[in-house]
């Protein structure tokens, strides 16, 4: 794939995308499609022209905190909220990986501490106003290796 083609794909990513679905399926075998943050998960991913991205995904319906002060919440409230939210941000680049168009997200900041300072590789398909992102490797979710798929629509 030419550098020019990768640049054009990068240009197509620029903007705000709203989550349509976030699914997972057991890797390497048949199994049910799961919805890690529920069928009604909500989220946005934003790509900027200067090469940065931000992704936010949540399960609706988290219990409200007992206070509006985010630094005074109880540990159990914080833990519950963290189980229903994924977020990271940093620079991004479009590359070729395993012969496929791939977006490399450099997670400078992340809700999951293990992600900060690392990168996330996502196979990337642009289909009109739809963006499909899939991690390049299976992930372990709740102890099971799964393949994930995130579908976004231009906001």
Regions from the language model: what does each represent?
Residues 1-87, 94-155:
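Lipid interaction determinants
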């Amino acid at each position: 794939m030419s550098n020019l083609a990768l640049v054009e794909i990068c240009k197509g990513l620029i903007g705000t995308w709203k989550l349509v679905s976030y699914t997972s399926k057991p890797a390497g075998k048949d199994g049910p499609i799961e919805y890690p943050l529920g069928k009604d998960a909500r989220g946005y991913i934003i790509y900027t022209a200067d090469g940065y991205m931000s992704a936010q995904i949540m399960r609706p319906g988290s219990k409200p905190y007992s206070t509006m002060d985010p630094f005074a919440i109880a540990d159990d409230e914080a833990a519950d909220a963290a189980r229903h939210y994924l977020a990271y941000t940093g620079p991004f680049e479009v590359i070729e990986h395993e012969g496929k168009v791939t977006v490399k997200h450099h997670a400078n900041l992340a809700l999951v501490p293990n992600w900060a300072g690392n990168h996330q590789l996502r196979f990337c398909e642009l289909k009109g106003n739809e963006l499909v992102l899939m991690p390049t490797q299976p992930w372990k979710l709740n102890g099971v290796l799964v393949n994930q798929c995130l579908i976004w629509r231009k906001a």
